[in-house]
Amino acid sequence: MFSPGTTVEVSSKINNKEVVWVPAVVIKEFKEDDEYKYIVRVYDKSFSCKGNKAARLNKTVDLCSLRPTPPSISVEEYQLKEYVEVFHDGMGWRQGRVMKIQERVMLSQGRVMVSQGRVMGNLSQKCYIVLLEATKKQISFKQSDLRPLQVWEDGVWKMLQTRESSLTQGSGDETSDSVRNANESDPPVTPRPGITTPPLKQIEAETQRKTLPRNQNASVNDSTRENENSEDINRKRKREESLCSDASVEDTTMTLPFEKKLSIWKTLESVETVPQSPHFSPLVETREDCREMSAVGMMLTFPCLLEEVKSLQHDNSISSLISLSNNFCELEKHGFNVKAPQSRISKLLSLRGKQSMKMDELKGAEKVTAEKESIKIENERKILELQRLNEEVDKEIAQSKSCAAKIVQQLEDVELQFQTTASAPW
């Protein structure tokens, strides 16, 4: 957990793909939905208040977006092909790779001279051409803008192998050069799953096979031919033993609780619909003189049941399907292979169940439709009744208007008589 005032780095994305780490300070820690959240303020790499004020606004992040500030490592000179982090345009620490090392020399006239080799003097300054991993752009950086690439894993900062080897060996060591050349692939920030190295014993065995002398190869070939001959003899013995065992198994499986005396057996056993080899062992508990006839009846019943399954219709009752399944169960006790028909019946039962459910849903929908139609008819009846009442009211309104007109005429006549009477001469 990060307490307020702790310097950290918060992850941010550029163009929704490149992750950069920006220096920040924890302002507040709080818990929301059983998850720790942090209010942080972003700064530049030196934690200065200069620069864009909008970039220093407080932001709320979760714990996965934070990591502590990596420990500072003093580096005299970065090596070629070394993975580093660079602080670019104030956006944060971005992952890159050193592609070229240059030295800049400040002249008295204020001009800058760039040299590929080393330049002695206090006015020289190293700069590095770094390839940004995300954009594949090469940009020049001062050494102060670089730091070794470290990985935060399982709460511990881990240094990449390239930096460890460069710290323990000289820059001119051939071994370190070979290590750097071998590491010219993408940075191993996280281990890639599924990449394994062959066991040491396997490599040694392959090497020995490649370096065997010719005389040893000849002896190996002779021994190989002897082994092949012995293997042929063993295979022949195994075939003979398997034939004997198959014959014994056949004798065992064909032992029936009765003797096949009826000629119909040849016809029954030639049926190729579903070849069967029932044992009829439950018939031991029945009368001996009835066993063969019972077995023949089962042999005749089985293909009939198969045809009955094939002739089933969608409107057959579920009870008929269950009855068929029970018949096959009885035959299974006598050694019939009923897996295929039972599987089909099981599927038909499932479909029949869905059909029954849909029929119930259809009945419910039809019932609702009938109820709504009944309500509609009742509403239409009420509408007709209201229309009839409106027509009667219209007639009454017309009569009232006619009566009112007569009354108005009578009032005018009375007023005229009143005026006539009042103005009559004496």
Swiss-Prot record:
Ranges of compositional bias, category Polar residues: 164-184, 213-222
Residue ranges constituting the DUF724 domain according to the UniProt record: 256-425
Top-level taxon in the UniProt lineage: Eukaryota
Summary of the tissues where the protein is detected: Expressed in flowers.
Pfam families linked: Agenet, DUF724
Localization: Nucleus
Regions of compositional bias (Basic and acidic residues) in chain numbering: 223-242
Keywords assigned: Coiled coil, Growth regulation, Nucleus, Transport
Gene Ontology, cellular component aspect: nucleus
Ranges in coiled-coil conformation: 370-402
Residue ranges of the region described as Disordered: 164-248
Role played: May be involved in the polar growth of plant cells via transportation of RNAs.
Entry protein name: DUF724 domain-containing protein 9
